[in-house]
Amino acid sequence: MYWVNGQRRNEVPIHDRSFQYGDGCFTTILTKEGQVQQWSSHKARLQACLDILHIPEPNWDRVWQGLQSMILPQEKAGLKIHISRGLGGRGYSPTQVSESIVTISAFAFPAHYQAWRDKGLAVGICQQRMGLNPLLAGHKHNNRLEQILLKREMDNAGWDDGVCLDINGKVIETTAANIFWCRDGTMFTPCLRHAGVAGVARRQILELAQQQEIPIVIDEFTLEDLLSAEEVFITNALLEVAPVTQIGQQRLTIGSMTRRFQESSNS
């Protein structure tokens, strides 16, 4: 059952432009004990993507009510907000499109995430490369084919996740998370000017680092930069913060900075 523009439905229309063209955006939200986490940040990110796609904003009060009605009664669970430009229009042209369509769905918290948070992940290095798209970089739009192909590659190779590089060999993210690493008391993360998704959890970590006066460098980095790290962790809204204990053949220890941010982001 889905929440669709204020109504409960079991299906979505085939003429929805998100189904036809991936014309929209989405976000995935963590709930804890029935409470929506980081809503203001999720809303801001959705609005930024809607603005770049020229999709009218929905009634956010109604969306909030929809979220509340869909929360699963579990210690941890997830909600997905999917916003489509709407129905209709001939071909790619959006000039004859109806109002935007907001769909909310609920799902159980991934069972393996807690083990990843506690013990860490082993990640590979994706051989396929991400393209450059500065117009849409940072936004979580509904076209995720690159991530699907990269995740398929890592699944077939037996890794938990994979480090994604762009066509110029710069580190961008993993297939499902943003990536941070630490060396000599300084934290590093890719800038995402040309590719990747700027996650809500990434934003939270950047804010926490600033509050705690931890030096952080946001720039373009090579794989060699990443492999010189003393500790590495990844973030997304559901997983929050999880340590990386292996990148390819290189082993890593779980560092104090990682545990510090796990504690800070969970408070």
UniProtKB/Swiss-Prot annotation:
Annotated catalysed reactions: 4-amino-4-deoxychorismate = 4-aminobenzoate + pyruvate + H(+)
SUPFAM superfamilies per UniProt: D-aminoacid aminotransferase-like PLP-dependent enzymes (SSF56752)
Swiss-Prot/TrEMBL cofactor(s): pyridoxal 5'-phosphate
Pfam families in alphabetical order: Aminotran_4
Cystine bridges: none
GO biological process, one term: tetrahydrofolate biosynthetic process
Keyword hit for Lyase: yes
Lyase found in the keyword field: yes
GO molecular function: 4-amino-4-deoxychorismate lyase activity; pyridoxal phosphate binding
Residues with N6-(pyridoxal phosphate)lysine modification: K140
Signal sequence, start to end: none
GO cellular component terms attached to this protein's record: cytosol
Keyword entries, A-Z: Folate biosynthesis, Lyase, Pyridoxal phosphate
Its EC number(s): 4.1.3.38
Taxonomy, superkingdom: Bacteria
Pathway membership, UniProt: Cofactor biosynthesis; tetrahydrofolate biosynthesis; 4-aminobenzoate from chorismate: step 2/2
InterPro entries linked: Aminodeoxychorismate_lyase_IV (IPR017824), Aminotrans_IV (IPR001544), Aminotrans_IV_CS (IPR018300), Aminotransferase-like (IPR036038), BCAT-like_C (IPR043132), BCAT-like_N (IPR043131), Class-IV_PLP-Dep_Aminotrnsfr (IPR050571)
Subunit details: Homodimer.
Family: Belongs to the class-IV pyridoxal-phosphate-dependent aminotransferase family.
Role played: Involved in the biosynthesis of p-aminobenzoate (PABA), a precursor of tetrahydrofolate. Converts 4-amino-4-deoxychorismate into 4-aminobenzoate (PABA) and pyruvate.
Protein name per its UniProtKB record: Aminodeoxychorismate lyase
Originating species: Vibrio cholerae serotype O1 (strain ATCC 39315 / El Tor Inaba N16961)
Name of the coding gene: pabC
